[in-house]
Amino acid sequence: MTSTPVSPVVLVILDGWGYQENSDGNAIATANTPIIDSLWTAYPSTFIQTSGKAVGLPAGQMGNSEVGHLNLGAGRTVPQELVRIADAIEDGSLATNPALDKVCKQVSQASTKLHLIGLCSKGGVHAHSDHLLALLKLAKEHNISQVCIHAILDGRDTPPKSAKDEILRLQKQIAHIGVGQIVTLSGRYFAMDRDRRWDRIQQAYDVMVNDQVAVPRDWSPLDAITDAYDHKTTDEFLPPTRIAPGAIEAGDGVIFFNFRPDRARQLTQAFVDPKFDGFEREQVKPLHFVTFTQYDSDLPTDVAFKPQNLDNILGEIVANHGLKQLRLAETEKYAHVTYFFNGGIEDPLPGEDRILVPSPMVSTYDQDPPMSAAKVTEEAIAALDKRIYSLMVINYANTDMVGHTGMMDATIQAVETVDGCLGKLLNQVINVGGTLLITADHGNAERMWDETGNPWTAHTTNPVPFILVEGEGRKIPAHGTDVQLRADGRLADIAPTILDILQLPKPEEMTGSTLIQAAGFEVRQNKSPVRIHR
């Protein structure tokens, strides 16, 4: 007995595809995008918000992929870790946080070293430098004399050469608080790799655990940064460098203060995973290792801010109704359509299939702007042919990953690649009667340089498009051809919209609302639409 072919709802997330009217330095507006341009004109479309309070971040804070996918899958505005930690600092509860209090007491009593590892940045995407300052004050309160800072430089979620200002600010606070020393520097390209490029992680790890690395006399963090700039190396790519003695040794305590897991996981594995095989190393133990948030439930670390429980997320509702779903992305965004979209759940839900397409092995993605978009599209078309999935979630990484390089021409090529792939995907969605939803998790490629003409490599606070291409096999009930979309939407509204199209009930935990406006007519028993006068 054959099952009835399914007409799916296909959610396509164009990572980093934002909107702004100004076309100057705008890779999306400059690129030739006939597919998405025609869809925007021909089908119901609107803009939605992906930053600030709309996604659980502080007002004015740019969104990011983790936050975006979390809100997309949860169907509610999820208070983000940046806000939770800032609140703990403000109300004083950081000082009594059990995991932080425990490691500080152990270090203080044993007279060992406390190491603070993390991204020194005001970007607020993976970490925030204010959190580091709060930890220095906490160490001071515990009378810890040896506090070693392993500073990771940003230049991706912040301007490419902003590290000097950040380090100067940190040094002033160190002098004011009276504790702490910067002992190593590393660009995030090395210390925060997430694509299993273990040679990068090893360089950062070796510098942190090895006191034998030669250090020039009177060598300061600013000297190292200046030297990098002189060699045309920006913050993100600064090679791991030892500045002063202070290696991570047995008996020490470590606090990794990045709050976003995906780019902190690999370095943490190198320190704490007894089965680690990314590169040869002698594990430092015993080591009391604390992570700000849960990077991986299998890692043996204490966690300062434990995961929030998100019940009745989109994937669970689909699974609970016995429907199959698919998550598809290349390596760089695979965790986002799986772990983050599922509210921090690692394992697949019942009936959830996953396809991982390897990202190209290049040092920076301006070297290969198409990335693996063609293979992602090929896998999506093959999955559509099966006619078994009620929901498909697909991420195209190009506009974000290439946009982060600050290279305009390469980003234009990335945008055009994705547009071409959308055309192929659209044809197959139409063939199977599915409904296609196109949106983004945050902006990026619409701003490639700043007001002074320098490369802009960070995300933006701009809105993103949302397009609804209604399919014959997945018609929206009671709307006919008169589907209208709200103009005040946010990412949390997309899950309720999908449930609306699938005709599944929205749980009370979902505080988002469907983007589909109430129909201007109703369908009577004779199936003829009757206009409602308002």
Swiss-Prot record:
Keywords: Glycolysis, Isomerase, Manganese, Metal-binding
GO MF annotations, alphabetized: manganese ion binding; phosphoglycerate mutase activity
Active site: 65 (phosphoserine intermediate)
Record: residues binding substrate: 126, 156-157, 188, 194, 260-263, 333
Cross-referenced PANTHER family: 2,3-BISPHOSPHOGLYCERATE-INDEPENDENT PHOSPHOGLYCERATE MUTASE
Biological function: Catalyzes the interconversion of 2-phosphoglycerate and 3-phosphoglycerate.
The protein, known as: 2,3-bisphosphoglycerate-independent phosphoglycerate mutase
Gene expressing this chain: gpmI
